[in-house]
Amino acid sequence: MPSFDVVSEVDKHELTNAVDQANRELDTRFDFKGVEARFELEDGKVINQSAPSDFQIKQMTDILRARLLARGIDIRCLEFGDVETNLAGARQKVTVKQGIEQKQAKQLVAKLKEAKLKVEAQINGDKLRVTGKKRDDLQDAIALLKKADFELPLQFDNFRD
């Protein structure tokens, strides 16, 4: 039976490149000259932003978003934490979401059932496996999920016929 997997993943290599480019842009921008501002990537899951002030953190967030979009990374996978300010400066943690959470996977399954397509969906950890008797049904399911607006980026892989 034909099947495919629905996943929500971020290419770690592209993420590293985007963070490096954002740091390079900080080094060349006039409004960040002589300022201790940095992006740091931890384990490919968390991006730490640090700068002297809250205002500069907001500017850095715009730079990060632009660099991620330029590298083809959907910014819906980012979860911005609160800005922590003290006398030494400001910090913000940006979490990169990987995988489909249980609640969101149930929403995807409900969307497929609601459309009454001849496909079955099952949740496998942080991904969703969709199977059907015909390839056309699977292609309709992919089109439906692409058209629907979920708060996370979806990729379709492991298409088997």
UniProtKB/Swiss-Prot annotation:
Cellular component per GO, a single term: cytosol
Keywords: Nucleotide-binding
InterPro entries: DUF520, UPF0234-like_C, UPF0234_N, YajQ-like_sf
GO molecular function: nucleotide binding
Family: Belongs to the YajQ family.
NCBIfam families: PRK05412.1
Function: Nucleotide-binding protein.
Name under which the protein is recorded: Nucleotide-binding protein XAC3671
Organism: Xanthomonas axonopodis pv. citri (strain 306)
Organism classification: Bacteria, Pseudomonadati, Pseudomonadota, Gammaproteobacteria, Lysobacterales
